[in-house]
A protein has these predicted regions:
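N-terminal secretory/targeting leader peptides
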Residues: 15, 29-119, 137-138, 143-336
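Bacterial N-terminal signal peptides
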Residues: 12-22
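Bacterial N-terminal signal peptides that target proteins for export
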Residues: 2-14
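Sec/Tat signal peptide C-region and signal peptidase I cleavage site
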Residues: 23-29
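A gly/proline- and charged-residue-enriched helix-loop-helix capping module
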Residues: 117-135
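Residues in and immediately flanking transmembrane alpha helices
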Residues: 20-21, 49, 129, 189
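A general, composition-driven signal for non-globular sequence regions
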Residues: 1-2, 20, 116
């Protein structure tokens, strides 16, 4: 299945690259647009690399982009506000962050809803997303260009397996698990059975090192990129969230672009997302062995027990009340 997804993604990415390249023309003004992008990710983060190496070159003949990595331009969680105020052009946002403004977005941050990378793309491109996208544009001034695959999130703990073996959510009781600070993230942490602690992403390594938190949750590529394997002892393959990000773009800036420029930006964003998705899938296939070589124990819990427990926490919750009627059923129908 993974190989099928990778092959399909590669074809899509290459096709997008060829299409955009064929559109390049000298008709644009010599005066380039000055764009800005802020992200909490590092320069080597897969999302950062995809946008820098794929998206930006495709629009370089009419736009220059200044990037602030590691939250050096805006603090994590403030980027959408910055775009809305006109102080930032683009960023990489999440369903959890959007849920702070629009609670219905919490459906895309719910455990065990998205099935895999291909399912994410189907959902994002389906008409069911149109009301979500329109609301973000109309009320926040942010255009969601494309969906990026971050990976399957797993629980990563400081304690060795000999001290704490996690098979069911009950085993995470009392575990101080770092989660991002939004309500949607914190609720997911509780649904997993842990005691979630809000903490900025750039503070996680030190918190794990000092014992301020017992663990964190992230996909394997992020664990490796941020070197969390240096300060943890085990990874439980919960796969509790097939995590995503959206490429967020200023609607105000978008409206100023010519028709051809809009098409170029959209195609470039889609190509970057496809390239990044391919890279993440390949990394996930290879990084388990790398992490084991660093001394970490990696194992699967009782996935059925986790899925049942997490979904039960959401049924009838305040988050579920905000979900548009029938949307969850539509999302499920697009899966396998």
């Amino acid at each position: 299945m993974i190989n099928k997804i990778i092959k399909k993604t590669l074809v899509t990415s290459i096709s997008a690259l060829i299409l955009v390249a064929s559109m390049v023309s000298p008709s644009f003004s010599a005066s380039k647009l000055k764009l800005t992008m802020a992200t909490s990710g590092s320069e080597t983060d897969a999302r950062s690399v995809a946008i820098r190496e794929v998206m930006f070159p495709m629009i370089s003949d009419f736009a220059d982009v200044k990037v602030g990595y590691n939250s050096t331009m805006f603090d994590q969680g403030t980027e959408l506000d910055a775009i809305s105020r006109g102080n930032l052009t683009m960023s990489i946002t999440s369903a959890q962050e959007l849920a702070q403004f629009f609670p219905e977005f919490s459906i895309f941050a719910t455990g065990y809803v998205h099935q895999d990378a291909a399912h994410q793309v189907k959902v994002f491109n389906n008409e069911l997303m149109d009301p979500f996208k329109k609301k973000v544009e109309d009320e926040l001034g942010v255009k969601l260009l494309s969906v990026m695959y971050l990976g399957k999130r797993h629980v990563n703990l400081r304690q060795p397996k000999s001290e704490l073996t996690v098979k069911t959510p009950a085993d995470l009781k009392g575990v101080n698990l770092r989660m991002p600070g939004t309500d949607a993230w914190q609720y997911l942490g509780k649904a997993l059975g842990a005691s979630p602690t809000p903490l900025a992403f750039n503070e996680v390594y030190t918190a794990l090192q000092t014992g301020a938190v017992d663990g964190q949750d992230n996909p394997l590529p992020t664990v490796v990129d941020k070197k969390f394997y240096e300060v943890t002892k085990q990874i439980i393959l919960t796969s509790h969230l097939v995590d995503l990000n959206y490429i967020a773009f200023s609607k105000k800036t978008w409206d100023k672009l010519s028709g051809e420029q809009k098409m170029r930006v959209q195609q470039a964003a889609d190509a970057a997302a496809s390239w990044g998705r391919l890279r993440q899938l390949q990394l996930e296939n290879s990084l388990a062995d790398f992490v084991r070589s660093k001394g970490l124990e990696i194992y699967e819990p009782d996935s059925a027990a986790f899925r049942k427990h997490v979904q039960k926490q959401y049924v009838g919750s305040e988050f579920a009340k905000s979900w548009p009627k029938g949307v969850l059923k539509k999302i499920n129908s697009l899966g396998n």
